[in-house]
Amino acid sequence: MDFNYGMLVPLSFIFGTISWRFLIATVFLENFKEWPIEKLIMPFICIHLFRYISISLMIPGLTSIGEILPFNDVLRLTLFDVACSILSMLSLFFLHKKWKGAMIFPVLLNVVGLLDLLIATLYDVPQFVANVTTLDARLFAVLTTFIPLIFVSHTFMVQLLWKYFRAKRQ
């Protein structure tokens, strides 16, 4: 009987997501519930500052991604991540300056970031699963630790944004 190694990618993603969810909910949020939403959302935004790191995916041979995905897909991943990095910088800048319309930037960050995750899940993850034995350790670690952190941070930011805009309507 052959073992399906490809299933280790989604399984590791699930474990990573659950782990980050527990960490954030039990350690971070428990201690900072009294903060205003504009301040509480900032650490979640900070997670996205470093998404520009996917520029390194464009360097041939640095990871195994070039053996798995076509160049245009790698370019798409990189551009979405760089856009999220820039949007997180703008979000933090305007939130720090207490600009009246600052919360629009976290909204844009979440729209772009969640769209990136959706497209990657639909088109790229199946390729990673099918080619799991060619993934290098760095790429596997990103897929199973950093991407779950990004996903969990988006879920918390969406919840905070929902609460923020609902409170503004009342």
Predicted regions and their residues:
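A glycine-rich, hydrophobic loop/mini-helix early in the fold
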Residues: 11-72
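C-terminal ends of transmembrane alpha-helices
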Residues: 53-65, 115-133
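C-terminal transmembrane-bundle signature of multipass membrane proteins
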Residues: 117-127, 137-168
